[in-house]
Structures are given as C-alpha cells and as structure tokens.
Design a protein with these regions (language model features):
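Hydrophobic residues in beta-strands and at strand termini
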Residues: 37-39, 84, 131
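Short beta-strand micro-motifs enriched in acidic
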Residues: 27-29, 99-103
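Hydrophobic beta-strand-centered segment that forms part of the acyl-chain substrate-binding groove
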Residues: 61-95, 101, 126
C-alpha cells in the first residue's frame, strides 16, 4: 500500500480548503510518511527563516500519520524532543519524513525530520504519543477528506468504522 493520504479537513497544515493553511499533501509508502515542504516568508520567525514552531507542527503531523499507518491507533502527542540542526529557510524545498518506531506499554514512539533534497537533516523530533481515549471514531473519520486518497488507503482508514 502506498500513495496519497487523506487530510483532516480543518487542519491548518493539511486541509486543502483552508485559505490560510499550508495545504501539505501527505504521502505514504511502507514504513514512511512524507510530504514536500516549500513555504514562503509569511511563516518566517526571522528574515527568510521559517518559524521553529511551524517546523515542529509539520513534523508533529507527520508523526501522527506515521503512527496511524503502522498501528491504526489514533494517537495524541504526549512528549517531544525537538532539535534544530540548521535554519529551515523560507522559499527553499524540503521533505518532511517520519517513521513509527515502536510501542512500549502505553507509549507509542515515533520520529520525524526535515531534510533537503541532498538528504541533509535540518530539524528532527522524537515523539511519544498516547492512544486517545473515548474518541468517537466515526466523528473523527468523517472529518477526513478522501478526495485525493488512493482507494486502498481510504479503505484502511474506513476499516476503523467496522
């Protein structure tokens, strides 16, 4: 299974109908979630440098998808460790990537990073998620836009409703 992932309709990061959003298209291939990132200076923290909080937000979303695609668990961020190695520049192309690593008791552990097209890593987050409790799965799934999603991936998401 691989291809375009559905997006949470209201997401600032991924929602296609959000005029103010980033409209990132999340992609999946076995054991890896990724998206292409090239943002303008509306999102800078310093001149020509993307705000670190925005970089973190992108990587947090990548981690969520990486966990879901490998575990079918709807997780929530509990703890993170973020490192910035180089400034992430506005107007420059990057790829944000993430992978599920393992489950330890109730902790779901994953990582995500932002790299350039040569593979140099600019930022990385190690994350610990926990499965959400008492979430109405149907309400959650109904908030997704599957219009660009590959049929096999759509079926994977909708299988939560069975």
């Amino acid at each position: 299974m691989k291809g375009v992932l559905p997006v949470y309709k209201d997401s600032f990061f991924c929602g296609f109908n959000r005029e103010d959003g980033l409209r990132l298209q999340m992609m999946y291939e076995p054991k890896l979630v990724y998206c292409h990132v090239n943002l303008d200076n509306r999102f800078e923290g310093y001149t020509d440098v993307l705000h670190g909080g925005l970089v973190f937000g992108i990587l947090d979303v990548i981690v969520w998808y990486a966990i879901f695609m490998e575990t079918k668990k709807i997780g929530m961020t509990r703890k993170t460790e973020m490192e910035f190695f180089k400034p992430v520049m506005s107007g420059s192309p990057y790829i944000a990537k993430g992978q599920f690593l393992r489950i330890e008791d109730r902790d779901i552990i994953a990582t995500a990073w932002m790299e350039d097209h040569q593979g140099d890593v600019y930022a990385k987050v190690d994350a610990l998620f926990r499965e959400g409790k008492d979430l109405p799965v149907d309400h959650f799934i109904n908030k997704f836009d599957f219009s660009r999603t590959d049929p096999e991936i759509k079926a994977y998401f909708l299988s939560l409703l069975e």
